[in-house]
Amino acid sequence: MSALRNYLNKIKPNFQEGGKLHAFESVFDGFESFLYVPNTTAKSGANIHDAIDSKRIMSFVVIALIPALLFGMYNVGYQNFKAAGTLDAASFIEIFGFGFLAVLPKLLVSYIVGLGIEFAWAQWKHEEIQEGYLVSGIIIPLIIPISTPLWMLALACAFAVIFCKEIFGGTGMNIFNVAVGARMFLFFSYPLAMSGDKVWIAKDSIFGLGNTLPDGFTAATPLGQLAQGGIPDASICDMICGFIPGSIGETSVIAIAIGAVILLWTGIASWKAMGSVFVGGIVMALIFQALGMTPIAWYEHIILGGFCFGAVFMATDPVTSARTEKGKYFYGFFIGAIAVIVRVMNPGYPEGMMLAIFFGNMFAPLIDYCVVQGNISRRAKRAINK
């Protein structure tokens, strides 16, 4: 690494003011700060120095996402071979290899488009490149169906980065989760590509791996089957493990739970917000079930669809979630409850987690305001009573 450090020091003057590559200063600084600790100090304001900076936070979140990503790759291949009836004859390498080749282009498109816009925006505004998209770039491909065309994904990434992040001031200033913005853009712009029975299974072989399925092949998700009053084909064990059709990274409760442990252990995610999402979903599901308004059991609401993934990786986003400690309880409960309400009250679309997180982001500042004003009011009353 010392050789790389020496090389960067050698070419750095070219990117500084007066250098022939000064136009790409932000790009160079972005790569340098990604590889090494920046040799800069704060220019203004009071700053608390800690061992955990934004780069390390993003790195821990990416590590927490890896189990869901790897299992998602395997499940993509698993569903393809299962649909073709050749699962028993396929090896682990064939199944995972097919899934890897199917998911990799989506990861590349997400990062190329998203980081490309961030680099261009930073250079245009003469600002430092932030690390925020390192997480969004991996989450966005994990919350879409495997059949989503790459051009749709590229449009969604561009929309999310520009209109959900950069126009608000960049990383740390956005009020809406970037991945939620991309998912909602796809759902409202291309609803047929985001829902239904034809989007969850990869249908084309890749470099000789996998199987080519008929164009008319369909496979409903267990949540979709339950929403229509049917009986899901998968067992509870398969639902928890993740061997079911669904968005790439949302199917395995176990893989998501591993990520949750990492986020909670490192202190990056708030257990108050995360736990409250599950409590809100369970309470609302029990209410609807008691009223006879849904055939879906409370635990099925939790383990199916994007509920677990959204609760662990998206509702806990420290930038877009509630900041006050008491507010995190209300924020999480609100998201969990709204997710189940949308699922039950909207018969045309069985999922509701992304919309719930969007509304949660919208109301987070109001929740914090109410909590702060409540604290001020109580302190004022105590002062008067004294």
Across the structure, where does each feature detected by a protein language model lie?
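Loop-to-transmembrane alpha-helix initiation sites
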Residues: A154, I175-V180, W298-G306, K328-F330, ...
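Hydrophobic, membrane-inserted alpha-helices
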Residues: V113-E118, Y133-L142, C157-C164, A255-I262, ...
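A beta-strand-loop signature enriched in Asp, Gly, Thr, and Trp
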Residues: M274-E325
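Membrane-interface helix-loop-helix junctions at boundaries between adjacent transmembrane segments
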Residues: E128-L209
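Structural signature of hydrophobic alpha-helical transmembrane segments
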Residues: F96-S110, S147-A156, M239-V253, P295-F307
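C-terminal ends of transmembrane helices
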Residues: A42-I48, G114-K125, I162-G172, I258-T266, ...
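N-terminal signal-anchor module of multipass membrane proteins
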Residues: M1-L107
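Long hydrophobic alpha-helical segments that form multi-pass transmembrane helix bundles
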Residues: G172-A257
